[in-house]
Every structure is written in structure tokens, then in C-alpha cells.
From Swiss-Prot:
This is UPF0280 protein Mbar_A3697. HAMAP family: UPF0280. Belongs to the UPF0280 family. InterPro entries: ApbE-like_sf, MA1715-like, UPF0280. Coiled coil: none annotated.
Length: 253
């Protein structure tokens, strides 16, 4: 899978430990200062993916629906987060699967003592960082290239998730080269990026109008859309910088 965001743009020579990890369809890049923190992320992915698979086996409709979904109160944590995010955006729960797995993995890393932790799950990124991190935006064939966003040091987890109609195999009904959403609720950022990307058609007016999909949701800090030669931003967007965005850095299946 090609994903529109790469957290290793402008990668310094002394970059912390980075590991590519695959568990069935889940393919992530994990970055941390300590191998124990990476192992914590991998174990969390194993646990929560297993819980999700068990739930889907009991109700296959969960995986198929593109509409809001109701789950029992005793559903696994991963399922409840996905349902809440999808319902908030008026779409199906699988729209939040990658961001939710990323968030749960980083939460486990923090419990293990990490102050610097990044999990990139196909362009849906959860992170906590005690130093600046540049997230590079990959927007396929768009003429807008080498664009990065600076995430300043912070002591709590945040997320940046992306959707694209022109890049990668994920379901999108729009024409965005990249639609990114910023939120401390990483599950919501993932579902919202899907909803935002669905609204993007070709042209400047469509880019401007697409942000209606995410306005009015307090937990969403900001959003960015790239379509062809056009770029639009709404709300609080991290500082823009130039980044060396290389296709080979992208976490993909």
C-alpha cells in the first residue's frame, strides 16, 4: 500500500531505532529510542488485532458496512474506538482501523516508558515526541511535492491520518491526492480523513468546500487537502516546512 504520509522525511543520521513490522494485513513502521518500546508496540498490535479478528468473526457485517454501526458495551476496546470514530463521521467503523491500531500501539509504548514513539500504519500515524518530528506529505502525482509538517515536542499522544483517492488501495470516493486530519483522538483522525477525502473532487472550489466534512467537530484540530495543483488548509495545522519526501520511506503493503 502506498500511503500519503511519511514520518521519516529529513531523517537525521542519528535517528532512533526504526523497525518495519507486519502481522497479516497490518504493516507498520515503529520508531522509538528503546527496543523494549518497539516490542511493547508489537505486542499491543498482536493483542488488539486478535481481538478485532475475533469480533469480525462473530459479526462479519462490522467489516463490510460503510454506514454507522452499533456495538455492544462489552465489545473489545479496539472495536469500540473504531465504532465511536466512524459514527462521529457518519461512516463505517473500518474507516478508523489503522489509526486505532496505531494509537493503541503508541499507548502501550508510553506505558513502557517511551517519551518518543511513532507508529505509522499505512499513513495513519500516532506519535508522542520529546523532540521535533517532521512528517512529510506524499501526494502521488500532485505537483505539490517535498512538503513537510513540523510536530513540536509534546508530552501526550497525537495523530495525523491521511486518505487519498489517487494513491493506494484503501476505499475513497473522492479525488484527493492527500487528505490529512490532525487530532489527539487518532481513531477520529483516521475516520475523519476518510470522510474528508470522500468530499474532494477536482478543482480549487472542491478543495475549499471539502472541509465542511470536518468542521464543527471539537476534537478535530485541523485538516489539509492536496488535489492536483491545489492545496487547502483549515484549522490548526502544524508548521509547514520543506521535506525530502522519498517514496521508499513510505510504509506500504
Amino acid at each position: 500500500m502506498s500511503d500519503p504520509i511519511n514520518e521519516h522525511a529529513n531523517e537525521p543520521a542519528s535517528f532512533p531505532i526504526k523497525e518495519h513490522f507486519q502481522l497479516k494485513e497490518t504493516i507498520v513502521t515503529i520508531a522509538a529510542d528503546n527496543l523494549a518500546h518497539i516490542e511493547a508496540a508489537k505486542e499491543a498490535i498482536r493483542i488488539h488485532r486478535a481481538a478485532l479478528e475475533t469480533y469480525i468473526f462473530s459479526d462479519p457485517y462490522f467489516q463490510l458496512t460503510l454506514e454507522p454501526y452499533e456495538c455492544p458495551e462489552n465489545a473489545p476496546e479496539v472495536v469500540r474506538r473504531m465504532v465511536k470514530a466512524g459514527n462521529t463521521m457518519g461512516i463505517g467503523p473500518m474507516s478508523a482501523v489503522a489509526g486505532t491500531i496505531s494509537a493503541l500501539a503508541v499507548e502501550s509504548m508510553v506505558k513502557a516508558g517511551a517519551k518518543y514513539a511513532i507508529v505509522d500504519n499505512g499513513g495513519d500515524i500516532a506519535l508522542i515526541n520529546d523532540r521535533p518530528v517532521v512528517v512529510g506529505i506524499y501526494a502521488g502525482q500532485s505537483t505539490i511535492k517535498n512538503l513537510g509538517l513540523v510536530f513540536e515536542p509534546r508530552g501526550s499522544i497525537t495523530g495525523v491520518c491521511t486518505s487519498a483517492g489517487t494513491v493506494g488501495p484503501s476505499i475513497s470516493f473522492g479525488m484527493a491526492d492527500a487528505a490529512a486530519v490532525f487530532s489527539d483522538d487518532v481513531s477520529l483522525a483516521d475516520a475523519a480523513a476518510t470522510a474528508l477525502g470522500n468530499e474532494v473532487n477536482i478543482g480549487k472550489e472542491s478543495v475549499e468546500a471539502s472541509f465542511k466534512a470536518v468542521k464543527g467537530i471539537p476534537e478535530i484540530k485541523g485538516a489539509l487537502v492536496i488535489q492536483g495543483e491545489y492545496i487547502g488548509m483549515w484549522g490548526q495545522v502544524p508548521r509547514v516546512t520543506r521535506a525530502d519526501v522519498r517514496y521508499e520511506y513510505i510504509t506500504k503493503a
